Amino acid sequence: AFLTGCDEGHEWILPWFIKNYKKHCKKPLVFADFGLSDIGRAIVRENVHAVMDLTKVEERGWFKKPLSMYKCPAKKTVWIDTDCEIKDNIDDIFNLLEPQKLSMVEDKPWTKRRGHRWHNSGVVGFIDKPTILGQWITATKNNVDQVGDQEVLDKILNPITKISKIKDLPNEYNVMRLQLTDGYNGRIRIMHWTGQKGKEKIRSML
């Protein structure tokens, strides 16, 4: 199943996300409720296959994301951030997943700007419950100084463990906004409108 989630502060994106998902995808969509309004909840219930309630867990904000991945009942799961624009059929992404690994696209803009290899957590695929997923959840609970779930995951990996725990997905499954600035001209199945400028771009499409 595909999995996404958000809280009330991001639910304005949901009609746009769901429309793109329904246009291109046939696989079930599971939603993790991080704290939606009643209106947001109604939109979700009408359009997804199952809803998971994560409103009462101790994790805050995007740190609920790894936990929602762990709790998703599907054997094969692909998390997609709500600021991702699905532009093509992506159902075949499930054929690329490997046991005991998180399947992710390299975050080339961050790799370029931060000096070591990063992977973007906007699209994360996995089979069953990989050990690294449990480690990611534990690290987010202990997190005090990292700014997001992607940074926490990067911190618990080194170049060697990255090879054994992360499977590289083709770039087309998660093309970052900054890649367009950097001259990317390859295929785009998922366009990831990151950051404030990305949100402004999404608003312009509503």
Predicted regions located by residue number:
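Structural element of the ATP-grasp superfamily
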Residues: 44, 69, 153-157
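Catalytic core and acceptor-binding pocket of nucleotide-sugar-dependent glycosyltransferases
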Residues: 126-205
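N-terminal anchoring/stem segment of glycosyltransferases
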Residues: 1-58, 161, 194-206
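Short, solvent-exposed loop/turn segments at the edges of secondary structure
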Residues: 118-119, 186
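Short, high-confidence coil segments that cap the C-terminus of an alpha-helix
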Residues: 26, 74, 98-101, 163, ...
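Short, solvent-exposed loop/turn segments at secondary-structure junctions
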Residues: 8-10, 36-37, 84-85, 108-111, ...
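Hydrophobic/aromatic beta-strand patches that form the interior of the parallel beta-sheet core
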Residues: 3, 30-32, 52, 78-80, ...
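GT-A fold catalytic core of metal-dependent nucleotide-sugar glycosyltransferases
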Residues: 53, 60-117, 125-126
